[in-house]
Curated annotation (Swiss-Prot):
InterPro entries: Ankyrin_rpt, Ankyrin_rpt-contain_sf, ATP-NAD_kinase_N, DGK, DGKI-like_dom, Diacylglycerol_kin_accessory, Diacylglycerol_kinase_cat_dom, NAD/diacylglycerol_kinase_sf. This is Eye-specific diacylglycerol kinase. The lineage of its organism: Eukaryota, Metazoa, Ecdysozoa, Arthropoda, Hexapoda. It catalyses: a 1,2-diacyl-sn-glycerol + ATP = a 1,2-diacyl-sn-glycero-3-phosphate + ADP + H(+). It comes from Drosophila melanogaster. Expressed specifically in adult eye. Belongs to the eukaryotic diacylglycerol kinase family. Residues 763-778 have a biased composition (Gly residues).
Length: 1457
């Protein structure tokens, strides 16, 4: 095609007024030239300014958006030319054209200069013109349409699969002040960290030129730095010719000044993009390495392409260099030949809008020139050097360190990283290229420092072209691109479409299509940062080559949840939950969705919403999303629900106990702002409902429910990290810090260095084998292991545990809801309670019943239970409280929220006959202010009546449905009506969803029975005895059709059958009496009118004998019972919550009552082997005594109390000073409590009935060289056969009280131990120690005989063991006896055990005694210490040892008891 040539530099027109105006009104391009003082330099700058301004104006006019061609027009198109109206103007093209024009002018200027070596190589910057909203593609604006999107403003959106395309006309919603504060905080923290790292590098930067002239003027430039910056700024802001003249003068004075003046431009100028292109005129003889070395260090660290390796000293302080990585941040690196791509740019031959350079005479119709060929040319290419910081934060820090103003990075026009540039051989290209010296030619990609530069350099030539000498400069090639076109695959479409459509098009086998890369490998490697790209540029157009495709399977994307856990979106998508997950798979921040249809509830995803599926609302945080949008909501941590528990280690759950605000964005809010006190306008609420406004009007805390305007005046930054007080319901809310998630099985990190379970098992097996030599110990051990294994299999693993903080002001309430009660009102109440309380203190009874919740919160102080349902629901909760073992102490008080049909118990307690949509907050406040009362509960025992034969009635049962009476028990016509109702409801549950309809059914059945009179002979079928008195005749006289046993005054939905005027006392729910009432068919319906039944008696015990099958009911649960004998007696009294009324007494319940704990001591050897086996460790532990302590005491206070008891009481054996607590009730293993954290833990955190302490001293006792096993291991091996040996030695039956122990040939009469404190003495202890029989000594000590037994000379068992060198006996006595025994002296010589060991030269025993606290300065009757005794006996080694220990023994020492 015919090419238009640009005029030469001499033919350029003078700048006109219009040109100047356009150059001033629009952002101008200021290009730095060589520092000269001639007048030609000024003219050159003026011409360059005018030319570039005219070029920019043509570009703006050319790339004006217009109509997209139709399908018919696209079919008629035979040219490869891309219509200008189908895509936006590329900034690369603008830079390319300006660079090409500048290159030609600078080349002419350089050829006319006298010497190229004297010119400065300092380059200027090319400013990209301002891109106004109406001058760029509308697709760029769509990226910022959603302010709440994570990628807004960074990349252009390519919608996901099943996601609608974002509308370009959507208005940008106002920003959220809460999100702004969060981003500002994170940005400030990031900037501070990077500034700390880069500050030392920035302060060492040098801006001197390589020429000698620049070096001489360096000091002068630094001295006038501030003045030159002001002049440069003023020069840029001036208009028309004054702008050009000022800029030229400043550039002539100093090349650095223009660079600084350009940076001192208005920081709010939108033309300041994220890239500054430096067009450098490299001096002759210089190389790329020299040019790179002249760059500042901060910029040089991001510049690549040098052939030489950077020295270690140069890059010593640099960071972030990925070893082996193909890129630095977003910087392009040389491509790898094995990763090409098929999407390319093709170069076009024609475009009349661009002026052609005068030095490129191409003949019309000449074949396209390949970029790789070497033709002769006249113009040496200039090497553009682009310096781009890796991030905006780096740029800001670098600018601050260099004294330059900080510019905000334009993120909305970031280049698309999915587009690659490749000059192809079959495309028509208008380029000029000259012969290139292959030895000096570098790849154009080697100097590219950003994506934009890479796109430019791929078509603009080699950077090495500017590095040659003046003589050889004409032999370097330079590729100048005139037009840029797209070469994209032809999908044979009738209209323009995006290339992305081929990726979303599914074939029959559920595969997508992907472009196959070509085999040449000449492509740029783009870093994969998961960025999206524009859809308006990638237009599908016909091309000469057909693209190749391959099948790509649709793999499931990875979903990241709020707590950091990832899962596959297609395979492991989490189900939508209504109630919290209590398993180990629970996720922090999970929502609890329920369907919603309220107007004004908009999806929280805004522009990312796919608008598919039913709208769902989170019950806890009130977030709204479509059903199909929920997986995307789970991906965003900013949309997570309020935290309900703490996912930390079991040793760190007390380190952080505060709860922070959880702010949620609200588009529709009622009420008023807490800060300013103004109500939210109704106009915005109406607009939100009618038009779906996406504006965030309020910020609400999901915990305390405080509401603030989305304004800086109402919501400040301090609210983000502020502690939340949980609002008006703080006393009854369970804080998230109370609920701790336990580590999964196998992930428990014990403090023990080596936990070898196999060794422990082998050790116990050896003991069993040794003990089984006499009588089958191995078999019993196997049976024990089987029993323990069965217990472990039955025990359910726990994933959560509640660690409350005892406080008398806290009254936690756990809620049990039966969703099926009251016409399915429970589903609605479930969400309301989850919104006001912690969702983990609200339980659905259909998800396993109340046992898990009661057992989990058993240690919560002053616990209260709210049962939402009918009377059956309350009875269910009370029955589970009876079954829990060990029972809850104290038992929690139970309140009632009536949702059932009758609700007689709720009426008796003052809570009303049913829930009538009252505010849940009001009910919670009343529960917190309620008073505790006692209620009688009665046991029902049913046995078959063998005196009569079974009448074989259908569906009859041998027992009543419930064995505990809470409300009433009845048999006869009323039970028959209730049974008919239950059977009908089970058959047709849809007919009984209204409370009024249920009552009408009851009335209908009562009227039917009134006519039939089926139970008129009831008194003939039963026998009634109350407190031993027969009342059958009274039933016969009254003609009763039903008999009631009332525990509460209310019956049958609010009636009162008992007449208060009858009887000796007024009925009460805690008087221990039941009211017996007879009812006829006539009286039964008259109860609704206020009448009463026939009062029979008040009794404490009743007995009913039936002779035929009769319907019976217990608390509304009815069934037919066969002939039987029924006995009723008092079971217990339950603690209930009653609505506070004046005159009613409150039961005083002490929620923080004292705990009775057994103290068990464990040695280190036992702990290391059996910390995972609680049963074995409990058997091996040594019982020290019992302590009574308050539950709110922390462990630091408990330690002081125990130390006092250990020192003062003789009943406690010796315990070392460095003992520590063991947590025995948190995890499946025992673990130690750090002494530094004892003030954070409470006694209720680590113990229930038994308090374990770990004695380090017993485990670290000095061992003798010839000792093969410790005492703990020895005692464990003997544990299985001790009882057998004791039974053989005793020779007694299990019921005998005394025994004969045969030691040698002398029978010794001993008495059985009776007192737990005062132990009995016996000579058998001394004989066992003298003979070295450890088994006998242990057996006697366990029977209660004291180790302090002495003979007539005052010698103890320890004296004999030291004298006869029985080390096992000495070790056992030291570990089991008190401190007094170690230092006891005999009456004859006044010697202690240490005297005897030193006298007998027993070094090992001396070491053990000293370690146990034996006194070294005790004198015998001769005035000798143990050391002096050793010297007298020539035991020099022992004497030296004792002498060395005298200075190290503590002053306080071991005090005698």
């Amino acid at each position: 095609m015919q090419q238009q040539q640009q005029p030469s530099i001499d033919q350029l027109p003078e700048p006109t007024a219009s040109t100047s105006n356009s150059a001033t009104t629009k952002p101008t391009i200021a290009t730095a030239t060589t520092s000269t003082t001639t007048t030609s330099g000024n003219n050159f700058h003026q011409q360059l300014q005018a030319t570039t301004a005219a070029t920019m104006q043509r570009l703006r006019t050319t790339f004006t958006r217009s109509r997209t061609p139709t399908g018919a027009e696209m079919k008629m198109q035979n040219s490869l030319e891309v219509p200008k109206q189908v895509r936006s103007a590329s900034f690369d093209e603008m830079q390319l054209e300006s660079q090409r024009a500048s290159s030609s002018l600078l080349k002419q200027q350089s050829s006319s200069s006298a010497s190229a070596d004297e010119r400065s190589s300092e380059a200027g910057f090319l400013q990209v013109p301002l891109a106004a909203h109406q001058q760029r593609s509308h697709s760029f604006d769509s990226a910022t349409a959603s302010a709440g999107s994570d990628d807004s403003g960074t990349f252009l959106e390519v919608p996901r699969r099943l996601k609608a395309r974002r509308s370009s006309s959507t208005k940008t919603p106002p920003p959220c002040i809460h999100c702004h504060y969060l981003e500002e905080y994170e940005r400030r923290m990031t900037a501070e960290q990077r500034y700390f790292i880069d500050h030392r590098e920035l302060t060492a930067l040098s801006y001197s030129n390589t020429s000698s002239e620049a070096s001489e003027d360096e000091d002068e430039v630094e001295g006038h730095n501030a003045e030159e910056e002001e002049e440069g700024s003023a020069a840029i802001e001036d208009a028309e010719e004054e702008t050009t003249e000022a800029a030229t003068e400043e550039a002539d004075e100093d090349p650095r000044t223009e660079v600084e003046s350009e940076h001192d431009h208005d920081p709010d100028d939108d033309a300041a993009l994220e890239m500054d292109i430096r067009i450098g005129n490299m001096s002759q003889g210089s190389s790329i390495e020299e040019s790179r070395a002249r760059l500042p260090r901060q910029m040089r660290r991001h510049t690549i392409g040098s052939s030489s390796v950077t020295s270690a000293s140069e890059d010593e302080g640099l960071e972030g260099s990925d070893n082996g990585s193909p890129h630095f941040g977003n910087t392009l690196l040389p491509p790898q030949p094995t990763t090409p791509c098929g999407i390319t740019f093709t170069l076009s031959p024609t475009n009349g809008d661009y002026p052609s350079p005068p030095h490129l005479p191409l003949d019309p119709g000449s074949p396209p020139i390949s970029p790789c060929s070497s033709n002769s040319g006249r113009l040496p290419a200039l090497a553009p050097i682009i310096s781009t910081p890796c991030s905006s934060a780096d740029a800001d820090d670098a600018g601050a360190a260099m004294g330059l103003p900080v510019r905000a990075r334009r993120r909305s026009i970031s280049r698309q990283e999915a587009i690659f540039v490749e000059p192809t051989g079959n495309s028509l290209e208008n380029v000029s290229h000259e012969e290139v010296d292959n030895s000096n030619t570098k790849s154009s990609v080697d100097t590219a420092d950003s994506l934009d530069e890479a796109s430019t350099m791929a078509t603009c030539g080699s950077p090495g072209a500017a590095g040659g000498s003046g003589a050889s400069s004409s032999h370097h090639n330079a590729f100048v691109v005139r037009d840029i076109y797209l070469m994209v695959p032809d999908l044979k479409r009738d209209r323009a479409a995006s290339v992305d459509s081929c990726f979303s098009k599914l074939s029959s086998n559920a595969k997508t299509e992907e472009l196959q890369p070509s085999a040449d490998g000449c492509f740029l490697t783009v870093p994969n940062i998961n960025a999206t790209r524009s859809r308006s540029v990638d237009i599908v157009l016909p091309t000469d080559e057909q693209a190749r495709y391959k099948a790509l399977s649709m793999t499931g994307s990875t979903v990241t949840y709020a707590d950091g856990r990832t899962a596959s979106a297609s395979n492991s998508r989490r189900p939508i939950r209504i109630v919290p997950d209590w398993t180990e798979n629970a996720v922090q921040g999970e929502h609890y969705w329920k369907p919603t249809s309220a107007s004004g509830d908009l999806c929280c995803l805004n522009e990312e919403c796919i608008k598919s599926g039913q709208r769902m609302k989170c019950s806890a945080c009130q977030l709204v999303a479509h059903h199909n949008c929920i997986p995307f909501v789970n991906e965003k941590s900013t949309l997570a629900c309020k935290p309900t528990y703490r996912d930390v280690g079991i040793r760190q759950y007390r380190e952080q106990t505060t709860t922070h605000h959880h702010w949620v964005h609200r588009k529709l809010e009622k009420g008023k702002c807490k800060q300013c006190g103004k109500f939210f306008p109704m106009k915005q609420a109406v607009q939100s409902k009618l038009f779906g406004s996406k504006e965030i009007v309020a910020l609400a805390c999901a915990w305390c429910h405080e509401i603030y305007h989305n304004k800086e005046a109402c919501f400040n930054q301090a609210k983000i990290g502020e502690e939340c007080r949980l609002g008006n319901y703080a006393p009854i809310i369970v804080p998230p810090s109370w609920i701790v998630k336990l580590p999964t099985k196998g992930n428990f990190k014990s403090s023990i260095r080596v936990s070898n379970k196999n060794n422990a098992a082998s050790g116990s097996g050896g003991g069993g084998a040794g003990g089984g030599a006499g009588g089958g110990g191995g078999k019993s051990k196997k049976q024990t292991q089987r029993r323990q294994k069965g217990k472990e299999e039955k025990k359910e693993p726990r994933a959560f545990i509640v660690k409350p903080i005892p406080s008398p002001e806290v009254i936690p309430v756990i809620v049990f809801i039966n969703p099926k009660s009251g016409g399915n009102q429970g589903h609605k109440l479930l969400g309301k309670f989850q919104h006001l309380l912690n969702p983990r203190q609200v339980f659905d009874l259909t998800q396993g019943g109340p046992k898990m919740g009661l057992d989990m919160f058993r240690k919560a102080p002053n616990l209260r239970v709210l049962a939402c349902g009918g009377d059956g629901t309350v009875g269910w909760v009370l029955s589970v409280l009876d079954q829990i073992q060990p029972p809850l102490q104290p038992a929690p008080a139970v309140g009632v929220l009536p949702l059932g049909t009758g609700n007689d118990l709720a009426r008796a307690l003052g809570w009303g006959g049913g829930y009538t949509d009252e505010p849940i907050g009001k009910i919670l406040r009343e529960i917190g202010m309620s008073q505790c009362v006692l209620m009688d509960r009665w046991r029902v025992k049913v046995t078959p009546n063998d005196d009569v034969t079974d009448d074989h009635v259908d569906r009859s049962k041998p027992n009543v449905p419930l064995n505990v009476i809470n409300n009433y028990f009845s048999f006869g016509v009323d039970a028959h009506i209730a049974l008919e109702f239950h059977e009908a409801r089970e058959a047709h549950p849809e007919r009984f969803n209204s409370r009024l309809r249920n009552k009408m059914y009851y009335g209908q059945m009562g009227g039917k029975d009134l006519i039939l009179r089926q139970y008129r002979n009831l008194s003939q079928w039963v026998t009634l005895e109350c407190d031993g008195q027969d009342f059958t005749g009274k039933l016969r006289d009254a003609g009763c059709h039903a008999v009631l046993f009332l525990n509460i005054p209310s019956y049958g939905g609010g009636t009162h059958p008992w007449n208060d005027s009858f009887g000796a006392s007024k009925p009460s729910i805690d008087d221990g009496l039941m009211e017996v009432v007879g009812l006829t068919t006539y009286q039964l319906p008259m109860l609704q009118a206020g009448m009463h039944g026939t009062c029979i008696c008040q009794c404490r015990k009743a007995r009913i004998i039936t002779k035929r099958t009769i319907p019976m009911q217990v608390d509304g649960e009815a069934c037919r019972v066969k002939p039987s004998v029924i006995e009723i007696e008092l079971l217990n009294k339950a603690l209930m919550l009653s609505k506070r009324k004046h005159g009613r007494g409150d039961v005083q319940v002490n929620p923080l009552e004292k705990m009775q704990l057994h103290i068990l001591r464990v040695t280190m050897q036992q702990y290391e082997q059996y910390h995972y086996d609680k049963e074995m460790l409990r058997k091996l532990a040594n019982k020290l005594g019992q302590i009574e302590i308050e539950s709110q005491c922390d462990l630091e206070h408990v330690r002081n109390m125990l130390n006092t008891k250990f020192e003062e009481s003789i009943s406690y054996p010796k315990v070392s000073q460095d003992w520590c607590f063991i947590d025995s009730c948190t995890a499946e293993h025992y673990f130690r409590i750090d002494r530094a954290q004892e003030h954070l833990h409470y006694i209720c955190d680590i113990a229930i009935d038994e308090l374990y302490i770990l004695d380090h001293e017993a485990a670290t006792m000095p061992q003798t060289p010839d000792q093969e096993r410790s005492f703990a291991a020895f005692s464990q091996r003997q544990a299985q056969n001790e009882r057998r040996q004791m039974d053989q030695a005793q020779g007694r039956g299990p019921g005998s009280t005394d025994e004969d122990l045969q030691i040698g040939s002398k029978p010794i009469k001993v008495m059985k131990w009776k007192s737990p404190i005062l132990e009995q003495t016996s000579d058998a202890i001394l004989l066992a120690a003298q003979s070295g029989d450890l088994n006998m000594l242990r057996a006697l000590h366990e029977q209660g005989y004291s180790l302090q037994s002495v003979n007539k000379n005052g010698q103890t068992a320890l004296h004999f063991a030291c004298k006869y060198n029985h080390r096992d006996i000495v070790k056992y006595i030291i570990a089991s006896a008190t401190r007094r025994l170690i230092n006891m002296a005999d009456k004859e010589l006044g010697q202690t055990a240490l005297h005897i060991a030193a006298e007998q030269n027993r070094r090992d025993i001396c070491v053990m005694l000293v370690a146990a606290g034996a006194h070294l300065d005790t004198l015998d009757s001769g005035g000798n210490t143990p050391m002096m005794v050793a010297f007298n006996k020539n035991a020099n080694e022992i004497a030296t040892y004792l002498e060395s220990k005298q200075g190290t023994q503590p002053v306080d020492g071991w005090l005698d008891d």
